[in-house]
Design a protein with these regions (language model features):
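Small-polar-interrupted transmembrane alpha-helices in polytopic inner-membrane proteins
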Residues: 13-18, 91-110
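Membrane-interface capping segments at transmembrane-helix boundaries
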Residues: 139-152
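Alpha-helical membrane-protein architecture signal
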Residues: 50, 54, 94-97, 101, ...
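Interfacial helix-loop-helix junctions of multi-pass membrane proteins
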Residues: 103-127
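Membrane-helix interface segments
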Residues: 3-7, 84-93, 119-120
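Membrane-interfacial alpha-helical segments at the cytosolic side of multi-pass membrane proteins
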Residues: 67-82, 128-142
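Short, low-complexity, charge-dense intrinsically disordered segments
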Residues: 152-158
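"…centered on the first transmembrane helix and the immediately adjacent amphipathic helix/loop
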Residues: 1-75
Length: 160
């Protein structure tokens, strides 16, 4: 049970946050309510076109980031919170497929929210975000593995 709270609960909480973000709460209309005043505060002369570009970019970056974090949490849970003794590449693929499937269902869910639309582009951004998150995880895992190998080779050998 301790393993569940440490590894799987963060995954479930993050899924809940993604699901909540797929509702009207984080629709473009809602996010513009705080972003536009903030951008106008930063630059009172900012044009509406520039605001629209920044708003669009931040929303897409949000998709990328939320799925990078989701995939990283999922990979961590699969790697540490299960009894799977699979290769890292298999865990990578499982985490990526799970994130991709959730991205599809997330966009499907948005098709039922009046202020949202399902977007294949957003789904692809989500899937790319998951891939980026997993690549970062693999880089850290490889770095950690090479450090442990270096420490083992530096240990003095016992003389017989």
């Amino acid at each position: 049970m301790k393993s569940f709270f440490k590894y799987w609960l963060p995954v479930l909480i993050w899924l809940g946050l993604i699901f909540a973000g797929s509702t009207d709460a984080l629709s473009a209309e809602q996010t513009s309510r705080f972003l536009v005043p903030f951008l106008r505060w930063l630059d009172p002369q900012i044009s509406l076109a520039t605001i629209a570009v920044i708003h669009f970019a931040l929303r897409k970056l949000g998709h990328l980031t939320e799925y990078a974090i989701f995939a990283a949490l999922l990979w961590r849970a699969l790697r540490r919170g299960t009894h799977l003794q699979a290769k890292m590449s298999i865990l990578f693929l499982l985490a990526w497929l799970a994130a991709a499937i959730f991205a599809v269902f997330d966009e499907f869910h948005q098709s039922f929210v009046p202020s949202r639309t399902a977007s294949p582009t957003d789904m692809m951004i989500d899937i790319c975000g998951a891939m980026i998150g997993l690549i970062i995880c693999l880089m850290f895992a490889a770095r950690g593995r090479s450090r442990s190998l270096n420490q083992e080779t530096r240990k003095p050998q016992k003389v017989r």
